[in-house]
Amino acid sequence: MLRYIYATDLNDHPKLARTMFRDRADQFKFRLGWNVSVDDVGFERDEYDELNPLYVIWEEPDGSHGGSMRFLPTTGRTMVNEHFINILSGPITSPFIWECTRFCLNRGVGRHVAAALMLGGGEVMQNFSVEHFVGVFDARMIRIYRIIGAS
């Protein structure tokens, strides 16, 4: 099931939140080898999780995380403007452009989860009048984005 949850509401879904942040640690720190912090309970979280982002999350039948993405409007703080400004010609700031980061899949899920998350991104665009998403991603993701038609 696809869920749309703001960070302030994650406490209403403790298993989903717990498994999402653990899956993020597994994917970004251990599988991809990114320089991200993992806390004592095994969660990968950063300062952008404190800004009340909108998460699009695939919830498995047992209530656990299958996959997720994090969205923030570029009218506020974003990772791309604060950490990757060197690859831009200037800051991206528009109510019609949102940042999408932390695209994460649980190791055991099927391709339908990635496709559902892309559908969720389309629904975010429709429901919030978003025209574009911006994000910086690992080059290995290009193949996945092409498979699901999002490149």
Role assignments for model-derived ranges:
Residues 1-44, 57-65:
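Short amphipathic alpha-helix that is part of the acyltransferase structural core
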Residues 41-46, 86-89:
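Short, P/G- and charge-enriched loop/turn segments at secondary-structure junctions
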Residues 45-56, 76-79:
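A short helix-loop-beta-strand connector motif used in the catalytic cores of GNAT acetyltransferases and
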Residues 70-75:
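Short beta->alpha transition motifs characteristic of CBS
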